[in-house]
Amino acid sequence: MLLIRNANIKTMAGPDLKNGCLLLENGKIAAVGQTVDAPEGVETLDAQGRLLTPGCVEAHCHIGLDNEGMRWEGMDYNEIVEPLTPQLRAIDSINPQDEAFGLALRGGVTTACTGPGSANVVGGTFAIVKLAGKRVDRMILRAPAAMKCAFGENPKGCYGHDKRQSPMTRMAVAALLRELLLRTLRYRDDKEAGKNPAFDMKLEAMLPVVNGEIPLKCHAHRADDILTAVRIAREFGLKLTLDHCTDGELIADELAKEQVPVFVGPSLGGKTKVELRNKSFTTAGTLYRAGLTVSIITDAPVIPLQYLPLAAGFGRSADGGGVARHHHQPGPQPRHRCACRQS
């Protein structure tokens, strides 16, 4: 057990506590309050007025799949061989010995949703993991957590521009995804009808998507790509998240009608491609005020994961603190969390 006292605590579930106490038991929070009951002789740490918060959660990154300080040797996040690879699983590439894990923990980030990049139209499944541990199997909170898909420049560039093959256009990106979804539905229907279709690893991986068990995790920057992702999800009755959502500020009213979770970022850094021309720290606040569930992301290693609190701070500052002010208002409120590499 560990008792932390005299801390300024951001509980994220109620009022802040000045000179409050927090009790840890077996690595988990057992109690928090202005005062807490603790056994006599418990190990005590005097925070001396320092800030104490829950661990930050990253909603989209590639930690463990794109290893710190490596070139091709540690780049295990994009299988740029064919544009549809739903059968790939993040947990088979995550390297817990990547030094980025320790750096993130020291920066206050304790949990991350990590997975494939956006070279492929469908890239494989993400996993939600704790960042402390030696073996990924014991770090998993949820796997599969989502199915990665990508719209816009990245799949067009990796295949159309670099390989001179489909998809060369946004039409082809959408068509490839639709075709995969239609094949999955037919495969599911045949299985349910007892027709015993030949085993297909790709379609098996897509079944949780069409069954509504996991969302499509949609990499989309440009406004039209964002709305194409929404259009396809609505056509097939799928859950989705909009990851990056760089142009979201331009279509906030339309996204508010759809009530789709948005993961905004990475907003630190330069505008390294055309899709990022409208990158802004104000996007998260605009979408939050429109009534959407918003998460600020690093897309690590685009922004190193330990700088997630910094990215969240910039987002709050650009919004004039409005996001934080909404947190303690009574009644139902949109949620905002600290929390996909553009790759």
Region roles according to the model:
Residues N67-I94, R135, K148-D162, V210, ...:
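Active-site gating loops and adjacent loop-to-helix segments of metal-dependent hydrolytic enzymes
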Residues I9, A13-T53:
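Histidine-rich, glycine-flanked metal-binding segment
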Residues A7, L22, G27, G49, ...:
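Divalent metal-coordination and catalytic microenvironments
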Residues P83-R89, Q97-A132, L141-N154, E213-L216, ...:
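Divalent metal-dependent hydrolysis catalytic cores, especially in the metallo-beta-lactamase
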Residues W72-V122, S166-Y187, A193:
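Alpha-helical scaffold segments that flank or form the walls of functional sites
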Residues I128-R231, E235, L268, P301:
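Metal-coordinating catalytic core of metallo-dependent amide/deamination hydrolases
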Residues E68-G69, M75-I80, T85, P215, ...:
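His/Asp/Glu-enriched, well-ordered alpha-helical/loop segment
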